[in-house]
């Protein structure tokens, strides 16, 4: 029966991919509440929902993984799609407000990127963005979104490879049942 038992962390909260998604949600929540007009701008709800969707789909995919590798994969892809949408909203804001999108050679990008890479604590981000301008917050959000996307692409690739090697839950259960029947019933 060991085929069915998979080693997983005790909680999704210990996963870097979840922790970074929580940071993205908190940065986005701060940004829309401080720089967008909630009563006139539909982007507020769309950005918050995209950030929330990423985080919640990671949670649901992790929880569903025990019963369905297909659900885990599908929800991870949805989380990635939500982040791509959110990334475009931040880029649109910067472009439409004539603000700079930091390239990889921009001094602020060079300073922020390695810090964002090592921090997955949303409290750290809340402290870092307090009092910053919209351009800085958007670019910090873009950095952590790109880092999260890199993790999600890697995770989805891992899930695809795992499926090719092990099959889905139904295949694993069927194989385990056949092994049990062979060992216990002789056929």
Feature roles, as predicted:
Residues 1-187:
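Amphipathic alpha-helical assembly/interaction segments
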